[in-house]
Amino acid sequence: MGVVSSNNDSMAIGIVQAAKENNLSLENLPILGVDATEEGLNAVAANEMACTIFQPAVGQGQAAVKAAIRMVKKESIASLEGAEDELYVWVPFEAVTKNNVKNYQ
């Protein structure tokens, strides 16, 4: 079984539409999106997409500002929550599936 992973929900919805136009079963073609847009969430709820990824903008913004402030002060970012090293600060994402999609709608 294959999986189609896309960079965003809009691309995933395009894949859903193309699959439908070509009479491909979405049941056997898991389609994954990113951004948890309204359209993507609706597609997950309708079992057209297997999942979408919610990326918390507030958490990403806070982490970016904290890192920027430390860098301006020439301080280490390694101790920030989610810091992998002096280059990356990871902010957790959340997978949205048919089991939890109602929490995001």
Predicted regions and their residues:
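Hydrophobic alpha-helical
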Residues: 1-42
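Short, hydrophobic secondary-structure boundary micro-motifs
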Residues: 3, 28, 52, 79-81, ...
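Electropositive phosphate-/nucleotide-binding environments in soluble metabolic enzymes
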Residues: 9, 55-58, 62
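Sec-exported extracytoplasmic/periplasmic mature domains
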Residues: 16-24, 45-49, 66-73
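A generic structural signal for alpha->beta connector loops
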Residues: 28, 48-49, 92
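Residues at the C-termini of beta-strands that transition into short coil/loop
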Residues: 35, 56, 99
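Short beta-strand elements at the ligand-binding edges of bilobed clamshell
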Residues: 46-58
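Hinge/cleft segment of the Venus flytrap/periplasmic-binding protein
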Residues: 62-105
